[in-house]
């Protein structure tokens, strides 16, 4: 038979057949990589097997892979007990870090992989699929990507298949780090940025305390570490460089693709809390257009409010937003009244239903308004009581209009709509130390409301002493000022 195959003897063909079948079996049972102690050969720019030593195979790297030499994928997750709005804040910490990290030569192709949303503590509805949700369900990924190089989890898997390594759809994670707090955080009264791998205590890979990310069926972890960590996100660069050095055998694999995981990322502090970098990342967190449309339709139909009538700024791209302080808002007041565990764990600062209603009615009279939109996790019984307390006023509360919409939005989407409606109110009052309230503060700062109409907090009782949330105004910048010279040796 004519062809370009080299002339191989019968023993060589038998050896080739044996190696091919053995490799295939190893990949099928998921042990091909875990049985190899050293992960250095697991992440090449193209898979180059022993076949190239026997057969004259052509180069198989597609152009999109050749252009991603040195890609570093950073997966992260958050403690399973943390809620939706704290997770948004953790994202900002990681996004600001990765945006700056990509200026380094070794990390020029870094990707931040967004973890699937697990079923969170506050998502109580039954009969809804509320685990493993992609970030695209809640956020506009194109908007996020204009700030930082992020990938939804399924997009990450798709890119991994381009590399064909170590046997798609399995993904080799070179190192996974579960971050922990130091037991003693101050040294002679001083807080110092530092980290160290834990060697004096057992470190369980199976624990979900750092988040359920590693339960994803596609992930195979090479080395798992517990790390005591204290400091801001920038310290993670040193941790990642140490891992890259351990995985690099020589010059030939310096630019190999790497994948690492950071668990309990809420341990990491902000590099730039409250400055223009923080606010650029926050402004990029536009909600999914589907959710924004549901909120816009509800505001128009139930509250007779549009972008134009509210006088807010909402350009198509967050980059076009400018400093503004003259937003008017719709003809309604929004109250975020946190109930649930706050009633038990924060009794000293959480008002009763009657006390909250008294405060809201006083505000409505002061602003000559009759409508209050209520965002709350109150029980159905508590909602009935609140309606009675507001019997001379109009109480509005968002609920999905059908079971189809409820299945589409899910509990997290309903909460997003609540926030978007509160963001457009003439006046807002929130709950003390609630991250849900904090995110509404931020949204209203971006839309252009005055601080006096935004940074307001429910008191325990009308006329009593009152703990109030802090005021942190938005910070604007004409352009990015985070450019810096790259002094990396490689």
UniProtKB/Swiss-Prot annotation:
Residue positions the entry lists as glycosylated: 29, 79, 368
GO biological process: fucose metabolic process; protein O-linked fucosylation
Broad class of the protein's primary localization: endoplasmic reticulum
Subcellular location: Endoplasmic reticulum; Golgi apparatus
GO MF terms held by the record: peptide-O-fucosyltransferase activity
UniProt KW keywords: Carbohydrate metabolism, Disulfide bond, Endoplasmic reticulum, Fucose metabolism, Glycoprotein, Glycosyltransferase, Golgi apparatus, Signal, Transferase
Keyword Lyase among record annotations: no
A single GO cellular-component term on record: endoplasmic reticulum
Annotated signal sequence range: 1-25
Active-site residues per Swiss-Prot or TrEMBL entry: 82 (proton acceptor)
InterPro entries reported in the protein's UniProt record: GDP-Fuc_O-FucTrfase, OFUT2-like
Chain positions recorded as GDP-beta-L-fucose binding sites: 81-85, 336-338, 418, 435-436
Regulation: Does not require divalent metal ions for optimal activity.
EC number: 2.4.1.221
Similarity remark: Belongs to the glycosyltransferase 68 family.
Biological role stated in the UniProt entry: Catalyzes the reaction that attaches fucose through an O-glycosidic linkage to a conserved serine or threonine residue in the consensus sequence C1-X-X-S/T-C2 of thrombospondin type I repeats (TSRs) where C1 and C2 are the first and second cysteines of the repeat, respectively. O-fucosylates members of several protein families including the ADAMTS, the thrombospondin (TSP) and spondin families.
Protein name: GDP-fucose protein O-fucosyltransferase 2
Biological source species: Drosophila melanogaster (Fruit fly)
Lineage, broadest ranks: Eukaryota, Metazoa, Ecdysozoa, Arthropoda, Hexapoda
